[in-house]
Amino acid sequence: MLDPFCFLKMYLKERVEVKTKSGEAYTGTLEGFDEHINLMLTCSSVEGSEDKVLFLRGENILFVGPRLLL
């Protein structure tokens, strides 16, 4: 099984999709993370609105994965 920190390092500076426990979906470029899996996304968007920088608290994150272009 892949260590979560190794997984996140693979996606640094890449477009990712993040789902939260409350059901929200965010997309953006993963700029950084810490030991609590708090994430910093840039050029992020959620449900049609865009922000330059977004911070997501690790305890609220359900999953992180590559942004799939469909």
From Swiss-Prot:
The keyword Ribonucleoprotein applies. GO terms for cellular component: nucleus; ribonucleoprotein complex. Residues 3-70 form the Sm domain. One of its GO terms (biological process) is RNA splicing. InterPro entries: LSM_dom_sf (IPR010920), Sm (IPR047575), Sm_dom_euk/arc (IPR001163). SUPFAM superfamilies: Sm-like ribonucleoproteins (SSF50182). It is found in: Nucleus. The keyword Transmembrane does not apply. Keywords: mRNA processing, mRNA splicing, Nucleus, Ribonucleoprotein, RNA-binding. It comes from Encephalitozoon cuniculi (strain GB-M1) (Microsporidian parasite). This is Probable U6 snRNA-associated Sm-like protein. Gene3D superfamilies: 2.30.30.100.
